[in-house]
Amino acid sequence: MAKKDVRDLEVSGKVVFVRCDFNVPHKGATITDNNRIVAAIPTIAELVNKGAKILLTSHLGKIDFKKTPEEIDAMKKKGDLSIIVPELKAQLEKAVGHEVKVTFCPATRGEELANAVKGLNNGEIVLMQNTRYEKGETKNDPELAKEWASLADAYVNDAFGSDHRKHVSTYGVPELLRSEGKPTGVGFLVEKEIVSLGRCVECSEKDHPYVAILGGAKVSDKILVIESLLKKCDKILIGGAMAYTFLKALGHHIGTSLVEDDQLDYAKKIYGSGKIVLPVDNVVAAAYPEDESATGEVVNSDEIPEGMMGLDIGPKTAENYAKIIASAKTVFWNGPMGVSEIPAFANGTIAVCKAAAENEGAFTVIGGGDSAAAAKKLGFASKFSHVSTGGGASLELIQNDGHLPGIDIIEDK
């Protein structure tokens, strides 16, 4: 079901609680990758142009309240959202073509925050301090939800990377506002995610063959998404360390490769579907690589020697996977094929990334995370039909057949 979006909302003169994802990589106050800020601009610009009073919210990093007070203070200092303001203001003014007043509120609740919101004029923005400064945010605390919702007349969710979490800012606030008859909608970024990933959930007959490429370390992390994809896909290409659990389940010697012994029966069972494709050769080494000078050697999948571990798919596998990808009409990729940050073990990831990027007749999607970073680094990201902004969220959306808490709570069109 299509969700109401920012275009559907009448927000002139109204306070809009906007949940963005400004969880950007940074060193001190220097932002090292502004992609998430840039991605949020179309939604914020739309609200500015509509004359909304905008309360912007986001998290930045993690805060573990089980730590000592000193450690918590250090985490809060690292997660101070004020570093976002200069880049946000610059990007927004470039988009709307005029000056926009953007202020920062260091408070996350209480009189200071309430006054900052009351002081907004139409088309102005206040960015609230990191939502995770509040212990109750990640617990969907009803009292915090009540306070934040009381500040707003409407709600917009544009934080896809957090939509698989039932937090106050992604779930509690819109739930309360909806119960009061106030409007809710998704932003342009979330709308694009719903539409693009939706094609991987509801893959029509004309969009087959449908090929999924799954990498990463653990089968256990991907059980639910594998089960969902088995119902939809024609082939699932397995790479990364999770491949060695499958290979061991089939009776291959895997040396010291990472394996989940408690998943062997499950791996064997789903291999029987006939849709799982495994590496026929691997790049191995005696130890996990510590730096970029590490080297490896190629061996067949049934010949990994004792004392050696698999760290990438081999050249025959890469060629085979590339051929399967080239014949696909829909491709979903999540997870590198090996230790892709080390050159000797990056070729498998490069091969699948290149094959998907060059399949111009296919609808190609990267499910965020390490795969998105790899595609960007290799210069292929722009050739994909869609690069998701949320790794965990994209996987959960696929395994839950298009449902996520932060999206489901938004009203339908």
Question: Which ranges hold each PLM region?
Answer:
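Active-site loop-to-helix "anion-binding N-cap" substructures in soluble metabolic enzymes
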Residues: M1-K413
